[in-house]
Amino acid sequence: MQSEISSFINYITVEQGLASNTQSAYRRDLETFAKFLDARKVQASEVSRELVREYLVELLQDRKLNARTVGRVLVTLRNFFQFLVFDRDLCENPCLNVEGPKATKTLPKVLSVNQVDELLSQPDVTKTYGLRDKAMLEVLYATGLRVSELTSLEVQAVNSDLGYVSCVGKGGKARVVPLGRSALSALESYLRHSRLALLKGKTSNWLFLNRHGEKLTRQGFWKIIGAYGRKAQIGIPLKPHLLRHSFATHLLQRGADLRSVQMMLGHSDISTTQIYTHILKERLREIYEQHHPRS
């Protein structure tokens, strides 16, 4: 099945122009499925609907993956087999008419403004890494960028004079997001002092660098933000998307309109942004129940 996987990845890269993170996710899903087939000595051309359903059940029950993740795996398999129908003359797509598990709608967690303030105060700005980390956290909260967008920023993406950052999001769509005073100040300090120290005489277009003077990876940033979350004693595992959720929720709490928040987040569909209005409703209910005498 390896040759089919390679052909498919090449197709989504060259023909569809999917982002490298999407390519990696597709490859991981397919490599795992290939091991499942190898254990049963089944070729890709021999996969049936029943076998696909069996695999999904295994992911849910044995590997304890959540319904949303399993649904994403099914999309990967459906696209892969549809490619084989056209490219390898497969008779039919075994994933057609296979329904994924129903995902329960859970509202994303958000930090309070006080929790964000506590988090942003953690980096030691007297040190090289602290200046960098302070700038990254400030920019992440100021813009609501995805972590992949943040780590892919180049120096020229920042316009300090006009106060905005340009990024490229999902599907290669470019957008411009404003930067607040705190983020601009942290960036200025980082660029003037910390980044030069990290470069160690080398040159790089990437905005945020690791200790080798190279582009900071998503995984590297996850470790950094997780460590600061534990240090701030926030009480929940701190992941980069938590600041993105907090960014959107805090804007709406202060009267921002949904369409503007959608544009800043880079959502193609406003229904994706509307999840944050549900968070506000839940928060209002909590406040009411805690403080109203007849709640």
Q: Locations of the language-model features?
A:
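Conserved catalytic core of the tyrosine transesterase superfamily
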Residues: 1-295
